[in-house]
């Protein structure tokens, strides 16, 4: 039956009618009643919107409250690349030798418990557990007005009665934006346990409307599964904001298949959750038609060994959802032409730091290569550095590479060619590693005049104290802390 809604307007507006199959009118056992944008409360008159004829369900020129063009249709890739780039550089810590690794559920209602037990017994599936409006015990007397009957809905299994006004009280900002069905409140309550707020629900609505129309039991089943494979509770919020479609992906037909695929690559169970959290969009890609061909391309075209594929995916999960044929070929051709890099060297770079396939050539590769040239390195030396420490391509010029070069030459009295032997120097923290160790050994008079030995910067603190300083680790750490506080005070004084 076609659904319709009545709203009052001061001036008649354009009518948008909805086909029953449109994303705004989603019917089925797994979804709540359709949620639609609310009109302004200041308007009067009325408009009738039907749900069965016109495919233009949203004005294509309409803007969201955030200035974004609204689309009723989901796009898995519209901004995944931009979003994912923020998360893919797990190992790009300024001091990579010291990289650090990356609640309570609401009490189940009696109704939810019964429904779940029924599912286990095979009586009813989660998707079928949603109660029809006609089956709800609304608690309305026979003499109640039709308007009251229309507004009264059963909120959830807790026995509370709800009206749309009550929904507006629970989620006022969301109710202002969306004509949300009270039957969807249990889903909102559940998602709130992951830290999602009303503004986040609006974002989810704008990104993928049907995500707020999912049966709460189905949503809980799917998120519980993700938690069971290692996704952190704190990561669910970020995943849903980036990929709200996850709530629609069934456990048996989608989630398990993708997790099984990752395990088949040799990725340990302890890393699965981290990969899923970093790239939730992978669930929108077909395992057979997209993900497996990507892996084959890595092996057959790029030249990554099959035994190394799992490591590559762990370092950069976004590689699974990239157009590798484009990203690989353009970067390989650039490095080959610019530096004379042989294929084997570029393959080594990808294996060590697959994130390079995300980096822009104009804004990422060229500025750093030109900087290394400007300090006196020839192409062959640059190639040695990049092959050994590819993450140089990701380091900031102003905040990282330039200050370290100046310290190398002016304070450590070394020549630039030493970087071909110790490229690791460029990846170490100037404040946390390079300067403290240098100053500590100078204070202890443990170094001779001349070039400072960069090999003293390589070992961990314990080995450094034993082999170079001849002191306890606590003594060195106390010195470093004093130095850091002094440097901080100097920077603060300069800003003042």
UniProtKB/Swiss-Prot annotation:
One of its GO terms (cellular component) is chloroplast. Residues 57-90, 102-155 are annotated as: Disordered. Disruption phenotype: Variegated leaves, reduced growth and altered structure of chloroplasts. Altered responses to sugars, abscisic acid (ABA), salt and osmotic stresses during seedling establishment. Altered root and shoot meristem function resulting in reduced organ growth. Its main location: plastid. Keywords: Chloroplast, Plastid, Transcription, Transcription regulation, Transcription termination, Transit peptide. The keyword Transcription applies. It is found in: Plastid, Chloroplast. SMART domains: Mterf. It comes from the Eukaryota. Residues 146-155 have a biased composition (Basic and acidic residues). Residues 1-44 form a transit peptide. One of its GO terms (biological process) is shoot system development. Residues 74-90 have a biased composition (Acidic residues). Pfam families: mTERF. InterPro entries: MTERF, MTERF_sf. Belongs to the mTERF family. PANTHER family: CGI-12 PROTEIN-RELATED, TRANSCRIPTION TERMINATION FACTOR MTERF9, CHLOROPLASTIC. Transcription termination factor required for processing and steady-state levels of plastid transcripts. May play a role in response to abiotic stresses. This is Transcription termination factor MTERF9, chloroplastic. The lineage of its organism: Eukaryota, Viridiplantae, Streptophyta, Embryophyta, Tracheophyta.
């Amino acid at each position: 039956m076609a659904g319709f809604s009545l709203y009052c307007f001061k001036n008649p507006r354009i009518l948008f009618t909805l086909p029953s199959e449109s994303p705004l009118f989603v019917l089925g056992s797994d979804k709540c009643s359709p949620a639609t944008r609310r009109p302004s409360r200041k308007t009067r008159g009325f408009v009738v919107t039907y749900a069965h004829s016109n495919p233009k369900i949203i004005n294509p020129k309409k803007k969201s409250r955030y200035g974004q063009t609204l689309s009723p249709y989901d796009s898995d890739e519209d901004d995944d690349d931009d979003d994912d780039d923020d998360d893919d550089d797990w190992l790009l810590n300024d001091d990579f030798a010291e990289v650090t690794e990356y609640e309570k559920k609401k009490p189940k209602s009696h109704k939810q418990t019964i429904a779940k037990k029924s599912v286990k017994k095979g009586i009813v599936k989660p998707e079928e557990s949603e109660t029809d409006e006609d089956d709800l015990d609304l608690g309305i007397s026979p003499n109640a007005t039709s308007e009251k009957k229309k507004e009264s809905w059963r909120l959830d299994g807790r026995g509370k009665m709800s009206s749309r006004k009550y929904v507006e009280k629970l989620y006022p900002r969301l109710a202002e934006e969306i004509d949300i069905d009270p039957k969807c409140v249990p889903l909102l309550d559940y998602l709130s346990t992951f830290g999602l707020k009303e503004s986040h629900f609006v974002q989810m609505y704008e990104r993928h409307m049907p995500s707020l129309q999912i049966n709460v039991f189905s949503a809980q089943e799917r998120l519980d599964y993700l938690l069971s494979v290692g996704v952190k509770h704190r990561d669910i919020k970020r995943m849903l904001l980036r990929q709200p479609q996850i709530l629609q992906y069934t456990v048996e037909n989608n989630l398990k298949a993708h997790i099984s695929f990752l395990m088949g690559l040799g990725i340990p169970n302890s890393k699965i959750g981290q990969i899923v959290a970093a790239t939730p969009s992978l669930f929108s890609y077909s395992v057979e038609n997209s993900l497996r061909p990507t892996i084959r391309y890595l092996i057959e075209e790029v030249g990554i060994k099959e035994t190394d594929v799992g490591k590559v995916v762990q370092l950069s999960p976004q590689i699974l959802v990239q157009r590798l044929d484009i990203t690989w070929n353009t970067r390989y051709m650039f490095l080959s032409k610019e530096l004379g890099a042989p294929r084997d060297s570029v393959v080594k770079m990808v294996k060590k730091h697959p994130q390079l396939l995300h980096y822009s050539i104009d804004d990422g590769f060229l500025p750093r290569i030109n900087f290394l040239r400007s300090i006196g390195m020839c192409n062959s030396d640059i190639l040695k550095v990049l092959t050994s420490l590819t993450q140089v391509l990701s380091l900031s010029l102003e905040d990282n590479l330039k200050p370290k070069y100046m310290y190398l030459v002016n304070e450590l009295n070394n020549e630039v060619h030493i970087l071909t032997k110790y490229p690791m120097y460029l990846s170490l923290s100037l404040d946390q590693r390079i300067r403290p160790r240098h100053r500590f050994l100078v204070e202890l008079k443990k170094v001779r005049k001349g070039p400072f030995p960069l090999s003293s910067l390589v070992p961990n603190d314990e080995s450094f104290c034993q082999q170079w300083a001849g002191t306890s680790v606590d003594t060195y750490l106390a010195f470093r802390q004093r130095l850091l506080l002094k440097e901080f005070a100097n920077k603060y004084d300069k800003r003042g």
